[in-house]
Amino acid sequence: MKIMLANFAKMVNDSGGLAKVTVAFANEMVRRGHDVSLLYCDGHQGDFFYPLDAKVRAYNLCWQKGRYIQVPWWMKLKREFLRPFSPVMSRDVNDQFMQKYLLGEVRRLLELEQPEIIVSSQPAASRLLLCDIAVEIPVISMSHGDPEDYFHIYPKGEIPAIEKSAACQVLLPSFVDHIKRRFPEQKVVVIGNVVPQYDVTADLQADKDRHKIIFIGRLVKNHKRPHLLIKAFVKLANRFPDWELELWGAESNKAYTKSLQHMIEKNGLQSRIHLKGVTRDVAGVLREGDIFVLPSAYEGFGLSLAEAMSMGVPVIGYKNCPAVNELIKHEENGLLCEDGVDALAEALQRLMDTRELRVQYGAQAKKSVEQYAAENVWGASVYS
C-alpha cells in the first residue's frame, strides 16, 4: 500500500515525542512492505534526530526549489497581535500561511506520490487535505494529544476535517468520547504509542552511594513544568543528602532555562540538580534512575513516563493531568498527587523513604505497559 504521512511540524534534529512517533511509524510501515512518503514543515534542512529508513521519501514543505518558504512578516505580526486576545485566531494565521504558501506544493506531491491512504498528524494537516484540497483519498486523523482541545483552542475551520476523516485515531480510551460526543457516526479507534519493552531494567535493589530522580521532557514552563520538580526536591534535599535530580530534555526558551539554573544555584544545589540536555540513550538514563517524575499540566500520552515504567522505575505524576492519570494507577504502579509543589514533595518523600515501595511500584509499572509492546500496537493498527 502507498501510505503518505502528513506531519506539518518540524522534524530536523527534533527530539520530541511527535517526531519520535512519526519516524517509528514510518519505519514500521516500511518494514511491513508498504511504500511510505512523509510531508513535514521545518525551517531547517538536515538529518532527523531519530533515524528514518532510507526507503521513506521525505519532503520538507517549507523548502521548495532550494528556497525557504517562511511566514511573511505581516503574518507573524498579525499572529502575535492576536495571541493575547485569541489563541484560536492566532493559530488560524498558521493555517492561512499553509493555505496560501504550501497548498500548491502539497497538491504537487499528492500527484507525484499517488498515495492510497494519508495519515495526518494534526487537524491543520487534515484541514488542508480534506477541506482546502478536498482529496478523495482516505485520510486518517491521528490525535497526539487530548482531542477535546480541538473544540476549544484550535481554529474552527479545522473541526470539519475531523468529521470528514475516514477514521480518527486516539491514544487512550477516555479520549474516544471527546470525538464521539460531537460526531457520533465517526469511526474512532484507540491505538496507543509503542513503548519499548526493556529486558534489562533498573536495579532498584542495589546498594548505592547516590540515588537518582529522573525527568525527561522538553523544558517548557506551562507544559512539562520541571520547575515544580526542582522546587519539590529543594524541600527534601537536606533530609535526603544521598539523592540527586537529573533533568533531561531540549531547551524551549532560554529565559526559562536560565530561571531553572538560577533556582538551582540560589539553593546551592549545583552538585545535586543537573540540567543534562538531550540524550540519545533514554534507556541508559532510565536504567540509572530510582524514581521518575513527570510534573506536566497535560499530556497526550506521556511517552517518557511510559518508557520509565517499562524500565521498572516507580513513577509520580499529577492526578489532574490527562493521560498521566491513566497510565499511573495510584499506589499500584506509582503515585498520583494533587497539583503543586507541596503535594509533589510529599509523594517524592514517600518513595525516597522506602526502597521496598519503589521496588513494588516499579515491578507493577513494568507489567502495566506491556500492552503497549510493538507487536500489540502495530497488530491493532488500522494501517497494517
Q: Where would I find each of the regions flagged by the language model?
A:
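Acidic anion/phosphate-binding donor-loop and adjacent secondary structure
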Residues: 149-153, 180, 192-211
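A short, well-ordered alpha-helix in the C-terminal region of glycosyltransferases
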Residues: 343, 350, 357-371, 383
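Glycosyltransferase donor-sugar binding loop
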Residues: 38-45, 216, 244-258
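Conserved acidic donor-binding segment of nucleotide-sugar-dependent glycosyltransferases
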Residues: 319, 329-331, 335-342, 350-355
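Short hydrophobic beta-strand element within catalytic cores of glycosyltransferases
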Residues: 314-318
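A conserved mid-protein helix/loop that constitutes part of the nucleotide-sugar donor-binding site
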Residues: 16-24, 211, 220-235, 245, ...
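Nucleotide-activated donor-binding/catalytic signature segment of Leloir-type glycosyltransferases, i.e.
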Residues: 258-277
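Aromatic "clamp/platform" in nucleotide-sugar-dependent glycosyltransferases that forms part
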Residues: 278, 297
